[in-house]
Amino acid sequence: MQIGFMLHVVAIGQATPTLTGDKANLLDMLKRSIIRYLPTLLLLASSLNGVVPSAKGQTKHRTYFQDPAVPMISLPTQFTSYRSNSDRRIPEAGQIDIARLKGPGCVRHIWLLPGDHTSLEVRVDDAPEPQIHVPLKPFFGIMHGLSPYPINCAAYSVFPNPLPGLPGTPGYNLYLPIPFAKSCRITLRGPKGERAVAMTDWHRYDNDYFLTPFRLHASHRLEKPSDPRGSYFEIADIKGSGFLAGVVIGYIQKNHSDMVFHTGGMTMLLDGETNPHVIRGHNVEDDFGFTWGFNDQQTRWAGCPWHVNRGRLDQDGVFYRFFGPDPVAFNSSLLFRTGSRGDDVESVAYYYLDVSASNTTRMVSPEEWEVVGLWPLNVKEDWERLVPLPKNTWPETVFEGDRPHKVHRLKSQRGWIDLQHVYFEKHHGATPLTMLNHAAYARTFIESSRVQKLQLKLSLDDTAVVWWNGKKAATLYHQEDFKTGLIEVKSIKGRNTLLIKTINTDAPMNKRMWAIHVAVELEENPSTFSGKEKKPGQGAKKKPKANK
């Protein structure tokens, strides 16, 4: 397990090279890693020895297998098989349970014959909120209210009935495992009289078997239309420790200036609270394993179950991608986005969260930013040059001579400032590629109740120059990869100014990526620091949720 790496920093003034990683989270990370990989260790031990001592001193065979749809989930090979049946209709109350199970156990397969306007709800271990509350058809990859079409992938299958005019006739089959320690309640919600016919196949385990800490969740999004070209469509905003199991997304083209797939691709902003790093895609078809558009093909892990091609600039489609062989893990959070271009977009993300994780952090991120740009980088001497900028609140436009530069007022999200959807090629209607060989300035104000030492934690994949209270603090060169630097500064009592010149060139491997992450590592009470500018007469307020 990688805990941190040595950072290359060009130290100027207060900058200090150091190891990354939040020490306060180290023990928690080790604990979670042990719990996460314990089934694999037990599987190895059982394969070598065949038996493991039980709590009562007797020997008992304890072997585990990897789930074929989600190999990150390891489950006991010793179990009792059960089936819960439902053959009813939704009553006046608008909901009905199709299964109520007592654990420890795991749902292995659900077959459903539902109505056409039904939503699926799954609540395990008496959680205060259901882990899954999604319209049933999108959950199974039938997007935008379309008539069901055949789907055959690792996570689920849909078998439409060829007879027309029979509502609720497709057979929906779910193969994503649903582990639970205490209980599992599966509910269908919908109009009175809709079918609620189901068979739920599940395994029950003895209490002394280790059960995976991962619990299945789903996130549903629908925008009609989505934001215009160059913006992003948020697939999921996840807090916690876990991994991404899959995604399905459907497009109905409304913007006919270019192909519907040319959105700029997916972005994953991971672990902003602990170890910021990124995963960047290309375009939609590339992210789902295709090239040069889509074809009506399905495989176990990626496919296109529905596609309408009325011409190059008029296509609709639904595409799935499941990460069985290559799961995307995160320790504290995941922001999952894809490019947007004004089309109708619907998505479902499937992920597992680790219920054993504590998710504590002692870092605070500035919330409100002023960003201004762009400045071309003609020669390398331009990189560290500071353009004169107003000291007070920036106006809507900043002028350098007679050249205007628009000011953007952004809110960070889990510490991330995503500039690829601010600065992109706007002179054409095709893929909105991120601007290269340009610089922008990002400024925020940090309130401190006293003089104290702070560690600025800045993550990026190119170059940045940092000024703290008007003095240059560091220059960071990260052209080879997305890395994190710690810069030691000393605050004054009251308002402190952090100014970052962020540079995007074609040097890094991820040249489509332009995002930075900023946080402050605290050694003492976080109440002595505020990442939000305090206005006169303003008292303490709860930190608002970041938004798009």
Where are these regions (language model features)?
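Bacterial N-terminal signal peptides that target proteins for export
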Residues: 27-39
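Short strand-edge motifs at loop-to-beta-strand transitions and within beta-strands
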Residues: 174, 320, 442-444, 483-487
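Aromatic-lined ligand-binding clefts that engage carbohydrates, nucleic acids, or primary amines
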Residues: 448, 452-467, 498
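Solvent-exposed beta-strand/loop surfaces of large extracellular or lumenal domains
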Residues: 467-487
